[in-house]
Amino acid sequence: MLPESDSMRTQPEQKKDTTFSGGIRYFMKERSNIVSKKYVYLFSEGNGSMRELLGGKGANLAEMTSLGMPVPHGFTVTTEACTRYYEDGKTIAPEIEAEIFEFVSKLEALAGKKLGDKENPLLVSVRSGARASMPGMMDTILNLGLNDEVVEGIAKLTQNPRFAYDTYRRFIQMFADVVAEVPKEYFERAIDLMKQKKGVKQDTELDADDMKQLVEQFKALYKGHIGRDFPTEPKVQLMESVKAVFRSWDNPRAIYYRRQNGIPSSWGTAVTVQMMVFGNMGNDCGTGVAFTRNPATGEKKFFGEFLVNAQGEDVVAGIRTPQSIDELKQLMPEVYDQFLEIATRLERHYKDMQDMEFTIERGKLFMLQTRNGKRTAQAAMKIACDLVDEGLITEEQAVLLVDPSQLDAFLHDQFNPAELKRAKILATALPASPGAACGQVVFDAETAKEWVAEGKKVILVRLETSPEDIEGMHISEGILTVRGGMTSHAAVVARGMGICCISS
């Protein structure tokens, strides 16, 4: 017979307190037993095991924060908030909005800056982050919090009006594209016309007055398409941006990518809101993407690219051809050494090749992302074997690092050497993704889809690819981009798909 526990013994019946104060005490006790769902987490409150809730980006930012790495302060709005957004008819519930603003206040306290303040303004990025990596498929907005008054404050604070107005025009362009769906081509055309007018080739050659003019042109473009002025209230900018990132989970390119990669539509995306650090303040600033090993070959060598005086989207978009990460060692040796040390720590911590985003502001390094890097089939095999030889993983773990679907692409097509000798070389470029391809040249993704449907083989040729090109890229034999580099959008996506790609 089991011994009688204390809870099993007969207890004397307690008399209920039916007074008003007793009722209040009962209500408060019951209320305290109800645990409300938490939809927002500071980076310092999460960790790398929380991918389902915080998404890959949010979980890894939290993990890097816990490891003491130089990560700008921020918070993550969970995937459950995204699910709730769709359940509520594509609206953000009042309690979730209130929680987001509560965490904005916490972020302001951590940063020592205030959103919308003219004297010491906080600017933030708003970025997507699904639990599975979907490079470039969803949306990002940088420099949020700017308006006509704040930009003047930043110009005064930094003594750098060119930087302030460059940052402002970038924000208007990204907000208009992502939130209001104003085609980005209108803004790019305005920039090209300004460069022609000034007789320069690069955005970086435009001065402060040029940037001011672009800001006014961009605001006029926004109003012309939307029918109302560009929003000036930072909290309105923030909530509209969070909604836009949630919506981007269901944009056509994201849906296509999920189908191709077996990612459930029910997962949703998290949203990271992070204090901005700036790579576009001058020549002691920059931004880049790097891998702990070569993602094309698997070679154990630090691999990546960066741009001086730029923001992160400039690198992945291929707007300018970046410099090799090796050149950073010459330009900023202390930053390079610190970055190399962090990269080594991250690979050992995650026990896999890492794909990292970083920004340098006034000679100081900041980590903005890390994730397991996309790689070719050959690279996957070499990296898995090397990690075993280095004692980082077991043979059983190595098998799991190679995606079975990649094995078909393991033997990339190669040209017949005799044919190569006879062929006339028209152009050479960077080997962004290995292989060989033959086909008819097409200049846009829509034409690629039409021609492939007619049974033709095509080579997709673009100035630079964008996420909107994903379907055309997937069905092409090969990809050629005029601008970009080894870490551009075209390169990263092509390697993941096992498609030959060269990028100038």
Regions found by a protein language model. Give the residues of each.
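Acidic, glycine-rich catalytic loops of TOPRIM or P-loop NTPase phosphate-binding modules used
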Residues: 498-504
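Structural motif
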Residues: 461-463, 481-482, 504
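N-terminal amphipathic/hydrophobic targeting modules at extreme N-termini
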Residues: 1-7, 12, 18, 22-24
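A short, small-residue-rich loop immediately preceding and capping a beta-strand
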Residues: 476-483, 501
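Nucleotide/phosphate-binding sheet-loop regions of phosphoryl- and nucleotidyl-transfer enzymes
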Residues: 29-423, 450, 456-459, 466-471, ...
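Intrinsically disordered, glycine-rich low-complexity segments
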Residues: 16-17, 31
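Extended, non-globular alpha-helical segments
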Residues: 431-468
